[in-house]
């Protein structure tokens, strides 16, 4: 059974539609002196796009299979994942309850009310604030218990949609990359992705190891040092591989030099990457995920950190709505 057939065994909603574009960034390539391509998961078709929709194809299908009437999830006030979960709930006629934290402890009006937070209101999500997501798995379980007592049938979507089931979405993305690579006759030496809640990274690690085993996958951390992030990626990678009856696991590569000072707080390199991509390519990155990941790619080229000097593929996970929340910093 090939990878596509294994994937087809899992219930899945068709939310993404056709494969997202894979394009060469010609002006950025000239600027960096290296062939750079981009996988446009920022233009998935719902709620201003983003990578979480791939995970929600599997997670929401599971919720419907279980007879849920409510999607429950958690994240930062400016969470792209929560925004996309709320949109999917609206599309499916489900209630959405979101547990939110303010990880950067700001009182900036745009952060508190604009960007992704504004969109949650449009999708009619029920928002509950908490002081901190110190144990999100337990906090979501407690919230689900309360909702059950009120007569709801909740389905807990993990933070970032990141578990073995959600990560199947990025095995599907790996299938698209392999097909598009073959069709365009480009052999990627490296793939770069933001590594946060770890499901996207783990899904690509499993998928690319099966399909493009010679391609290096680099996860640029957005919230943790390698010592803390590595077990998260490996845990999902292992569970995902088990669910697909895959024995061989690729080693995980992480770069943690680009997320300081902390998750959700912009830095100079990330903001410079946002400006560069906007001005060179008309592509919008964000200050939390893709801007910092692109800063890693740019510095990785400059410092010759990649395994070899072939074409690099950047996975654009989305997040542009957060630009409005971080004004005037951006």
Curated annotation (Swiss-Prot):
<dbReference type="GO" id="GO:0019148">
    <property type="term" value="F:D-cysteine desulfhydrase activity"/>
</dbReference>
<dbReference type="GO" id="GO:0046416">
    <property type="term" value="P:D-amino acid metabolic process"/>
</dbReference>
<dbReference type="InterPro" id="IPR001926">
    <property type="entry name" value="TrpB-like_PALP"/>
</dbReference>
<dbReference type="Pfam" id="PF00291">
    <property type="entry name" value="PALP"/>
</dbReference>
<dbReference type="InterPro" id="IPR023702">
    <property type="entry name" value="D_Cys_desulphydr_bac"/>
</dbReference>
<feature type="modified residue" description="N6-(pyridoxal phosphate)lysine">
    <location>
        <position position="52"/>
    </location>
</feature>
<comment type="subunit">
    <text>Homodimer.</text>
</comment>
<dbReference type="InterPro" id="IPR005966">
    <property type="entry name" value="D-Cys_desShydrase"/>
</dbReference>
<dbReference type="InterPro" id="IPR036052">
    <property type="entry name" value="TrpB-like_PALP_sf"/>
</dbReference>
<dbReference type="InterPro" id="IPR027278">
    <property type="entry name" value="ACCD_DCysDesulf"/>
</dbReference>
<comment type="function">
    <text>Catalyzes the alpha,beta-elimination reaction of D-cysteine and of several D-cysteine derivatives. It could be a defense mechanism against D-cysteine.</text>
</comment>
<comment type="similarity">
    <text>Belongs to the ACC deaminase/D-cysteine desulfhydrase family.</text>
</comment>
<keyword id="KW-0456">Lyase</keyword>
<protein>
    <recommendedName>
        <fullName>D-cysteine desulfhydrase</fullName>
        <ecNumber>4.4.1.15</ecNumber>
    </recommendedName>
</protein>
<keyword id="KW-0663">Pyridoxal phosphate</keyword>
């Amino acid at each position: 059974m090939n990878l596509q057939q294994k994937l087809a065994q899992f219930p899945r909603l068709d939310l993404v539609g056709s494969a997202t574009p894979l394009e060469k960034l010609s002006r950025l390539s000239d600027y960096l002196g290296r062939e750079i391509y981009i996988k446009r998961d920022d233009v998935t078709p719902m709620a201003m796009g983003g990578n979480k929709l791939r995970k929600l194809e599997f997670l929401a299908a599971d919720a419907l299979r279980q007879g849920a009437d409510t999607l429950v999830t958690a994240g930062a006030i400016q969470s792209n994942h929560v925004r996309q979960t709320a949109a999917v709930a609206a599309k499916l006629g489900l209630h959405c309850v979101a547990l939110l934290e303010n990880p950067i402890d700001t009182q900036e009006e745009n952060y508190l009310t604009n960007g992704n937070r504004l969109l949650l209101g449009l999708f009619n999500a029920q928002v509950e604030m908490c002081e901190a997501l110190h144990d999100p798995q337990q906090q979501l379980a407690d919230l689900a218990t309360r909702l059950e007592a009120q007569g709801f049938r909740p389905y807990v979507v993990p933070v970032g949609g990141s578990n073995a089931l959600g990560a199947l979405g990025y095995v599907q993305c790996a299938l698209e990359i392999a097909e598009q690579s073959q069709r365009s006759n480009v052999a990627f030496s490296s793939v770069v992705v933001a590594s946060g809640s770890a499901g996207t990274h783990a899904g690509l690690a499993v998928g690319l190891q099966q399909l493009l085993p010679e391609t290096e996958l680099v996860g640029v951390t957005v919230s943790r040092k390698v010592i803390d992030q590595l077990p998260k990626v490996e845990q999902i990678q292992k569970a995902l591989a088990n669910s697909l009856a895959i024995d061989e696991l690729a080693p995980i590569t992480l770069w943690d030099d680009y997320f300081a000072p902390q998750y959700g707080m912009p830095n100079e390199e990330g903001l410079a990457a946002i400006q560069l991509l906007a001005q060179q390519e008309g592509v919008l990155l964000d200050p939390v995920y893709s801007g910092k990941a692109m800063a890693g790619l740019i510095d990785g080229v400059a410092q010759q950190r990649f395994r070899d000097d072939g074409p690099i593929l950047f996975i654009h996970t989305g997040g542009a709505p957060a630009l409005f929340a971080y004004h005037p910093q951006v």
